[in-house]
Design a protein with these regions (language model features):
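Short helix-coil boundary/hinge micro-motifs
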Residues: 1-226, 256-257, 263-280, 284-287, ...
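Short loop/turn segments at secondary-structure transitions that flank enzyme active sites
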Residues: 224, 242, 253
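Extracellular/mature segments of secreted proteins
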Residues: 244-245, 255-257
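Cysteine-rich micro-motifs
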Residues: 230-250
Length: 321
């Protein structure tokens, strides 16, 4: 029996998928930072998926109506390409692959299961957009620290009555298939055996509420990030292309630069440093003398930072050193 497993481990989320149902050696084994799958789903352009899903649905329809195996193969090829766009879409491939294989073995096309899967394919473009809107609304009212505050439990309790949202545009939680099993050496964890994309969305949202994790838009890139560390964090550590700085790294440098640019002691030091560095090219000072001076200038700057000497005394020293 096929499976799509999802579980959390500290600041990570892990997915394992297998169309044959073989435990321990899944065909897909992926790891992301915590909440990354939900955040990238929220950012995904679902409109691009609509024509692809429509083609897959048409080919699946021909398969179950006419037993057109070529159409079924074409549907599976497109599902295989589609799954590379997002980890949630792996579920479609695994589930449809399982059914396509069983259909070939037993020749039981046209079953109620096939019709249900066809209906799901046809409805999926609209459903994906709906899920995105519901997640965004949940962020606005429950998880976004800047609009909803720092207590997701309190906000969730305020916005839900029993198992129903007070606002119909909010995500609706339902029972999900959770297990509990070893996931790492010496450690067990709740594990979601997902039957649908909403299951994975549900598990991510409820886990944030249970763990008291809020989200915030990054001050640099504008994307959401989970506040798994300091709730005052303004810059994200979302994945970036190899060789690029994360927003948190870039933000720390920007903050340091701004702080230094507003510091009169640093400005005085920097002005004299640039002037004397230019003297090297002009031949007025040697490299050795320049670096010896800069070392003394930094020591004097530290004294000024500690108020051992005044700014005026430091500026005077720089001019006469």
């Amino acid at each position: 029996m096929w499976y799509v497993k999802m579980y959390f481990s500290e600041k990570r989320e892990l997915f394992q998928c297998d169309a044959s149902g073989i435990q321990g050696v899944p065909s897909v084994d992926r790891e992301f930072p915590f909440l990354e799958s939900l955040l990238t789903f929220l950012e995904m352009d679902c409109g691009e998926l609509t024509p692809i899903l429509q083609r897959i649905a048409d080919r699946w329809s021909r398969l179950i109506a006419e037993f057109d195996r070529d159409a079924g193969t074409e549907a599976m090829v497109e599902l295989g390409q589609l799954k590379s766009r997002h980890i949630y879409l792996e579920l479609l491939y695994v589930r449809w692959y399982d059914r396509f294989s069983r259909m070939g073995i037993y020749g039981d096309r046209g079953s109620a299961e096939d019709e249900q899967m066809l209906a799901e394919l046809r409805d999926l473009p609209e459903q994906l957009l709906l899920y995105q809107k519901q997640v965004q609304r949940f962020f606005d009212l429950v998880l976004d620290v800047d609009s909803a505050g720092r207590d997701p439990q309190q906000q969730a309790a305020k916005n839900y009555l029993h198992d129903s949202p007070r606002d119909p545009s909010l995500f609706r939680f339902r029972p999900i298939p959770l297990s509990f099993e070893p996931v790492e050496p010496g450690r067990c964890s709740p594990v979601l055996y997902s039957a649908s994309i909403p299951d994975m969305i549900d598990y991510s949202l409820r886990s944030c509420v249970e763990r008291g994790i809020t989200v915030r838009r990054c001050k640099n890139c504008g994307r959401y990030f989970p506040q798994t560390g300091r709730v005052s964090a303004e810059y994200c550590e979302r994945p970036v292309p190899r060789g690029q700085q994360t927003c948190r790294e870039a933000g720390a440098f920007q903050q340091w630069t701004k702080k230094q640019s507003d510091d009169p002691v640093f400005k005085a030091y920097r002005k004299e440093y640039k002037k004397r560095f230019a003297w090297i090219k002009a031949g007025r000072i040697s490299d050795t003398d320049f670096y010896a001076w800069s070392e003394r200038a930094r020591e004097m700057k530290k004294k000024c930072d500690r108020d051992v000497i005044t700014l005026e005394e430091y500026v005077e020293w720089l001019k006469n050193s």
